Structures are given as structure tokens and as C-alpha cells.
From Swiss-Prot:
It comes from Pseudomonas savastanoi pv. phaseolicola (strain 1448A / Race 6) (Pseudomonas syringae pv. phaseolicola (strain 1448A / Race 6)). Transmembrane segments: none annotated. This is Ribonuclease P protein component. GO terms for molecular function: 3'-tRNA processing endoribonuclease activity; ribonuclease P activity; tRNA binding. NCBIfam families: rnpA. It is an enzyme of class 3 (hydrolase). Its EC number is 3.1.26.5. The lineage of its organism: Bacteria, Pseudomonadati, Pseudomonadota, Gammaproteobacteria, Pseudomonadales. One of its GO terms (cellular component) is ribonuclease P complex. Keywords: Endonuclease, Hydrolase, Nuclease, RNA-binding, tRNA processing. One of its GO terms (biological process) is tRNA 5'-leader removal. InterPro entries: Ribosomal_Su5_D2-typ_SF, Ribsml_uS5_D2-typ_fold_subgr, RNase_P. The gene is rnpA.
Amino acid sequence: MSRDFSREKRLLTPRHFKAVFDSPTGKVPGKNLLLLARNNDLDHPRLGLVIGKKSVKLSVERNRLKRLMRESFRQHQDSLVGWDIVIVARKGLGDVENPELIQYFGKLWKRLARSRPIPEEKSEPAGVDSPDA
């Protein structure tokens, strides 16, 4: 899988965001943000960011956060295959320094990857064609 952040790896329409907000299958709360995720049945993850003026006042800070989130997502996307992810920023996130944020996002991605339900293996009943028969 390429480690780019092309258009296909972004949530673009309000419908995509609404689907994640309405029925998230994974939820990782953090101190200053909330990470919501939903299975997307694709071979790549998609990311959407919600950083409002109420939670982070200065546009410089909002843009810095978006840049760091996208870069962290790009680096960890191999472990996030099949998720639509929305990150919702909360108050105080803009006050956190870059190195701390990078480490924080790394931990959140790992927590999200661990929260994925493990698919059950399909066992075939012992029949005529099975080696147990």
C-alpha cells in the first residue's frame, strides 16, 4: 500500500462524515480529541478532520493540527485498513506541542487498530469431502 494521502483516502462529503457519526464501530476518546471510526469495506482507510473555531481559536493552530494529523495518519495507514476515521478536536488541543502530539496520535492509532473486532474463522462442518470423514 502506498503511503500517500490522495483524494481516495479522505472523507469528502457530508454523507461520509454522517455515516461515521451516526454509527461508529470504533471509538477512541482522548484527552483533547475524539476519534470515531467505522468499517468501510475498502482496501484503504479514509480520514476526515473536524477542528472547529470553538475548540482551536487560531487558524494557524488549526492548520498545524491538521497537518500533523494527516502526516501521522499517512505513516500509520497500513494498520488502519478498512476504517473510515473522523477526528474531532476538543478544547486545549492547540496548546499541545508537536512532539507530544505526534506521540499522542501514534498511541491513538494503535488503540484504534486494537479495537477492531477479530473476524471469526469459518469452520466447515465435517462432511463427505473433509479429511475428518
